[in-house]
């Protein structure tokens, strides 16, 4: 991925201006989920690779450290090791699963295979109600285990605070050094008191206040935006989704009428969406300026003959930026006679934390796919980027949007990718295929809304397998139509997702309507893949 060089005026990261819990990722499947759970406790948190040198971690002056799980055995050669310096720095530490075992291993405890593995829901045999992590909790708890090794002897100075049949030392603590650990995964919903355990560590063990709130985020971000943009002007790409709407609202609060929002109609939106966006913008940003740009022919021409998904994302990202550069020139030209006009220097984008992670923006992170507003930017971009949501998860963005007073229809709008239907057509993007997919998508959205499932699912991409034809029977003859794929998922932040269990009667209505009302489609299939291993979007 091409990384754009930071500008000298780029504001300091949030971790530099507020107490931050760093989650050290030892290869956990759900390291991002740990960070989310910490933020749910109103404490700011970020994820860093466990391979980060201890000195570099401590330079950031973390308020606390949480050590994630991981697939390795601490005693095997080449396994990730915990630097004892992190345990000697006086920073509160909580180890989870592998992180728990790494604490024991580093401080002289014993980690071994006991012959009893624990996977899934497990009942704690004993809990010390006087311990920091379990104070004022039910003594009977069900937790989510996933381990073959176990701590059989705690390090010197540690009190054992919980145990199970397969883990004689399932939790321990050293109050004096403020080091704690549990063998299970409190971050997952299957651990009945998991969030309470994390909150006990954060608020009691580490002594952190609950200061990470939507109102606090707004105040901090508005100040940072003013610091970054100064007296210059900005334009914001408005898509109609919650991300760009909240980003625009934050920037508008910071710089007022020096922000112009631009909506690029690239022809890849869903049925009736452009008109909805114009109306919603008026409700959310009354009096603000919105420039509508019709670039449908330009995008469709650029995508002609292109089938590779990464190539499509790159093309859409580049055309998007070029369209903005033209809009910038027009805005500047209009204000030439205004003596108070200043340079239009910044491009506001609704980039989120998961976008950055999936695009390889984190140190040591693998590039899963290029997001059009992160890794899809051209090298010679003429703007400086302002990304006020870059450190937020989706649920936090919604909370900020609600706090800002945005319409509910925007705040709770289901996610829709920037490249639009262009990455939901598997194959070349043509006008005929877009029209076909729009109709199928409209049917799905209408039926899910009628069934009251809007808030129960995260999103439901409808995918057209444009390069595939299947044999069908309609009336008295054979048909050779395209399949469409329904991809309903449940999620909290898009980092992980499960396929949504849509009621059979709803699926039946959707299938019947699509195959009867959409010419060229004769088969509807359901994608039942979780994330991981599959991403939410097919491309």
Swiss-Prot record:
Residue numbers binding ATP: 239-245
Subunit structure: Homodimer.
Residue span, GMPS ATP-PPase domain: 212-413
Annotated catalysed reactions: XMP + L-glutamine + ATP + H2O = GMP + L-glutamate + AMP + diphosphate + 2 H(+)
Pathway(s) it belongs to: Purine metabolism; GMP biosynthesis; GMP from XMP (L-Gln route): step 1/1
Enzyme Commission no: 6.3.5.2
Enzyme class: ligase
Active site, UniProt feature: 97 (nucleophile), 185, 187
Gene for this chain: guaA
HAMAP family in the cross-refs: GMP_synthase
Protein name: GMP synthase [glutamine-hydrolyzing]
Keywords assigned: ATP-binding, Glutamine amidotransferase, GMP biosynthesis, Ligase, Nucleotide-binding, Purine biosynthesis
Recorded GO CC terms: cytosol
SUPFAM superfamilies: Adenine nucleotide alpha hydrolases-like, Class I glutamine amidotransferase-like, GMP synthetase C-terminal dimerisation domain
Keyword match Oxidoreductase: no
Domain annotation Glutamine amidotransferase type-1: ranges: 20-211
The keyword Nucleotide-binding is annotated on this UniProt entry: yes
Described function: Catalyzes the synthesis of GMP from XMP.
GO molecular function terms listed in the Swiss-Prot or TrEMBL record: ATP binding; GMP synthase activity
């Amino acid at each position: 991925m091409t990384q754009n060089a930071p500008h000298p005026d780029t504001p300091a990261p949030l971790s530099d201006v507020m107490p931050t819990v760093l989650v050290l990722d030892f290869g956990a499947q759900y390291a991002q989920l740990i960070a989310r759970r910490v933020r749910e406790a109103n404490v700011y948190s970020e994820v860093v690779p466990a391979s980060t040198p201890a000195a570099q971690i401590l330079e950031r002056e973390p308020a606390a450290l949480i050590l994630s799980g991981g697939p390795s055995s601490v005693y095997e050669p080449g396994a990730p090791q915990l630097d004892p310096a992190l345990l000697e720095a006086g920073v509160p530490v909580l180890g989870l699963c592998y992180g728990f075992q790494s604490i024991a291993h580093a401080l002289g405890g014993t980690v071994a295979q006991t012959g009893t593995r624990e996977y899934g829901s497990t009942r704690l045999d004993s809990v010390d109600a006087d311990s920091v992590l379990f104070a004022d909790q039910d003594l009977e708890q069900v937790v989510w285990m996933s381990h073959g090794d176990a701590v059989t002897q705690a390090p010197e100075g540690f009190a054992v605070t919980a145990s199970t049949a397969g883990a004689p030392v399932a939790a321990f603590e050293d109050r004096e050094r403020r080091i704690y650990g549990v063998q299970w995964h409190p971050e997952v919903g299957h651990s009945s008191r998991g969030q309470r355990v994390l909150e006990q560590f954060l608020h009691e063990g580490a002594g952190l206040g609950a200061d990470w709130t939507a109102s606090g985020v707004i105040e901090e971000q508005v100040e940072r935006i003013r610091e970054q943009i100064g007296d210059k002007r900005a334009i914001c790409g408005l898509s109609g989704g919650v991300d760009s709407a909240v980003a625009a609202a934050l920037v508008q609060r910071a710089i007022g009428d020096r922000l112009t929002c631009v909506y690029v109609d690239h022809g890849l939106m869903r049925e009736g969406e452009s008109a909805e966006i114009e109306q919603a913008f008026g409700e959310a940003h009354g009096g603000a300026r919105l420039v509508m740009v019709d670039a449908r022919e330009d995008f469709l021409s650029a995508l002609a003959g292109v089938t590779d998904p990464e190539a499509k994302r790159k093309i859409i990202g580049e055309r998007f930026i070029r369209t903005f550069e033209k809009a910038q020139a027009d805005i500047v030209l209009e204000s030439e006679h205004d003596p108070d006009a200043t340079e239009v220097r910044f491009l506001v984008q609704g980039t989120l934390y998961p976008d950055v992670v999936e695009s390889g923006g984190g140190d040591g992170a693998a590039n899963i796919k290029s997001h059009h507003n992160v890794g899809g930017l051209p090298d010679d971009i003429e703007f400086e980027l302002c990304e006020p949501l870059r450190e937020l998860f989706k649920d936090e963005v919604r909370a900020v949007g609600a706090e800002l007073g945005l319409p509910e229809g925007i705040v709770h709008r289901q996610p829709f990718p920037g490249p639009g239907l262009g990455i939901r057509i598997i194959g070349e993007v043509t006008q005929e295929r877009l029209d076909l997919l729009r109709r199928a998508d409209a049917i799905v959205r209408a039926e899910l809304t009628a069934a009251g499932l809007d808030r129960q699912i995260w999103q439901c991409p409808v995918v057209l397998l444009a390069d595939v034809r299947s044999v069908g029977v309609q009336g008295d003859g054979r048909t050779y139509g395209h399949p469409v794929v329904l991809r309903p998922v449940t999620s909290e932040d898009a980092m992980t997702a499960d396929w949504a269990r849509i009621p059979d009667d709803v699926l039946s209505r959707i299938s019947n309507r699509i195959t009867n009302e959409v010419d060229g489609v004769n088969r509807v299939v359901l994608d039942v893949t979780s994330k991981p291993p599959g991403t939410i979007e097919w491309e």
